[in-house]
Regions:
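Secretory targeting signatures
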Residues: 1-40
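Residue-level hotspots at or immediately adjacent to binding/recognition sites across diverse folds
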Residues: 38-265
Length: 265
């Protein structure tokens, strides 16, 4: 009958409308409703440290299993004594960006405009370099006290400075480069490497009084190198007191390792 067909058509129309509305509502819910599994419920194995700052943090150093420092922009220094559960801000006494921190008996920090800070336990002592540019890295082969220590720092425009005998000596004229030097590492008071912009690798065996350029692989000479470490070092009690290998990392995933031994690697 016509009424039956009309009734059947209405049913089909209602069914289509219900299905369409259901899909439309589901789409809206998926679009605007947060995921049922929140980020907090996903265990990534990482927790955010409770440091309240918007400043970039440029370096971090663990002194032992419980104590660590984090440093960064605008002279910010943070310290934890309970394995990162709590962090307290320390007064650095400076507003310059801090770029690197090292420890050899005492924590030492370098930063922009020649900033050098030394931790004496409860506070930071300024030992900055007048006239120096931005300092990017440091190496501390010897530290007994400020008066009895050897510290090397590197920075902009080929700058390398050495602290010894209670004074800073400018070694920049000996580096043979005006490239920024981003990293420096010494295994003792005499032997060290420094790396920087445009594939720069230089080495010294006389405490920085002279530096020799080390050829980097040709394909990496346009890249900047950001860090260097000397490992496998043989100490004075061994037959050959020289670095065994040098590892350098840098731009575009660069990782290169010396294939020779000793300071001529």
């Amino acid at each position: 009958m016509l009424s039956d067909k009309y009734s059947s058509g209405k049913k089909h129309g209602r069914t289509f409308t219900i299905i369409f509305c259901s899909f439309f509502l589901a789409f809206i819910l998926l679009l605007f409703t947060p995921s049922l599994i929140s980020e907090e419920e996903i265990d990534t194995g990482w927790d955010q440290a409770p440091i309240s700052t918007d400043n970039d943090l440029n370096d971090v150093l663990a002194l032992n299993s419980t104590s660590a420092f984090a440093i960064g922009e605008n002279g910010k220094i943070y310290h934890t004594v309970n394995s990162g559960v709590n962090w307290s801000e320390q007064d650095s006494g400076v507003i310059q960006d801090l770029n690197a921190i090292e420890f050899n008996g005492q924590a030492i920090v370098v930063g922009d405009s020649g900033t050098v800070l030394i931790n004496d336990g409860d506070s930071w002592i300024g030992n900055s370099i007048e006239g120096a540019g931005n300092l990017y890295d440091l190496s501390v082969p010897h530290f007994e006290s400020l008066a009895d220590s050897v510290i090397f720092v590197s920075g902009t425009g080929g700058e390398i400075w050495k602290w010894s005998d209670n004074t800073w000596d400018d070694l920049s004229n000996f580096t043979g480069t005006t490239n920024d030097i981003y990293a420096i590492d010494f295994v003792n008071e005499n032997e060290g490497f420094a790396v920087g912009a445009d594939g720069l690798i230089i080495a010294t065996i006389d405490g920085g009084l002279s530096w020799e350029i080390r050829d980097s692989p040709e394909e990496f000479r346009g890249f900047s190198f950001y860090d260097v470490t000397i490992f496998g070092y043989k100490g004075p009690s061994d037959d050959e007191a020289s670095p065994v290998s040098v590892l350098i990392v840098g731009e575009n995933g660069t990782v290169i390792q010396s294939s020779g031994t000793g300071p001529t690697a």
